[in-house]
């Protein structure tokens, strides 16, 4: 699973990139989505790579951000009790590990919003105009996206 976080805004941006971010459900800065590792999603992420940060998320980090930032319809927080009653998993950690392994999707939890509205990272982004390999905050992070997500929890 990939975690994709929008880092830059879309003012004065090409229409195809705006539409790609819209298809990824990224409408605002610091919003995060969890997408499967399919060629279709990877193509969309590569098209928007200059506006997003992305990488492979692990189960522990995903469980943390689902606990802190997961929301249900009506802006209610995602709780252990709701996951137990709505799915066959006993906790958010079990659901997160199944999600990372590809056994389940986000939409399998009814009323779970697909977008996680994250806090800006503590200590800030390095720079939003350079890629991660150049010392910035854009593009492919690999497994180090987990550090960014923990800073944004």
UniProtKB/Swiss-Prot annotation:
Taxonomic superkingdom: Archaea
Record-linked InterPro entries: Ribo_uL30_ferredoxin-like_sf, Ribosomal_uL30, Ribosomal_uL30_arc, Ribosomal_uL30_CS, Ribosomal_uL30_euk_arc, Ribosomal_uL30_ferredoxin-like
Listed GO biological process terms: maturation of LSU-rRNA from tricistronic rRNA transcript (SSU-rRNA, 5.8S rRNA, LSU-rRNA); translation
Record GO cellular component, one term: cytosolic large ribosomal subunit
Alphabetical keyword list: Ribonucleoprotein, Ribosomal protein
Keyword Ribosomal protein: yes
Short name of any one Pfam family annotated for the protein: Ribosomal_L30
Keyword Ribosomal protein: yes
Any GO MF annotation of the entry: RNA binding
PANTHER family: 60S RIBOSOMAL PROTEIN L7 (PTHR11524), LARGE RIBOSOMAL SUBUNIT PROTEIN UL30 (PTHR11524:SF16)
Annotated NCBIfam families: PRK06049.1, uL30_arch
Family: Belongs to the universal ribosomal protein uL30 family.
Subunit details: Part of the 50S ribosomal subunit.
Protein name: Large ribosomal subunit protein uL30
Organism: Methanocorpusculum labreanum (strain ATCC 43576 / DSM 4855 / Z)
Gene: rpl30
